[in-house]
Amino acid sequence: SLHGVAYEALPGFGLKFEAYVAKTIAEYVLDNESRGRVWLAELGGRLIGCTAVALRSRRAAQLRWVLVDHSARGKGLGRQLVEAAIRYASNSGASLIYLETTDGLPESQALYEKLGFELVSSKSQELWDGVRPLILMEKHLV
């Protein structure tokens, strides 16, 4: 529900987006077993941030569901979550971490770029609310 609350005001990120995210989380749980990790950030017993990594192969990891509640933005929590995910991927032997995002999230894309992710491709694809750009970014790990 954190995704639903955080994105509800953005055009194209309504209930269908929340259902799409719920579906991808269910797939992660069912298919991933112990091949990844989830981070949750709480403040006063309330969820204020999250992210996850799925180890997709021996060398590639996928960054998933980076989200920080509006009340906690601008304080470095997003950076801390993504940096923890990058460390985990690197320590797990991955030489590459990648993510998929879409348009309408310039703050997220700026954070990813600051942390060394580079744009690989942007192509139109059928997503939760019709055709949108699916943006692929990746970071090579040392």
Predicted features along the sequence, with ranges:
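Conserved beta-strand in the GNAT
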Residues: L40, R46-L55, Q62-L67
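Conserved GNAT-fold acetyl-CoA-binding loop/helix
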Residues: G4-Y28
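C-terminal "cap" of GNAT-fold acetyltransferases
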Residues: S95-V142
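Conserved GNAT acetyl-CoA-binding A-motif
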Residues: V82, Y88-T101
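A short helix-loop-beta-strand connector motif used in the catalytic cores of GNAT acetyltransferases and
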Residues: Y28-L40, Q62
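A short, internal acetyl-CoA/4′-phosphopantetheine-binding micro-motif in the GNAT/acyltransferase core
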Residues: E42, V66-R73, T102
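Conserved acetyl-CoA-binding loop-helix of GNAT-fold acetyltransferases
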Residues: V68, G74-R87, A110-K114
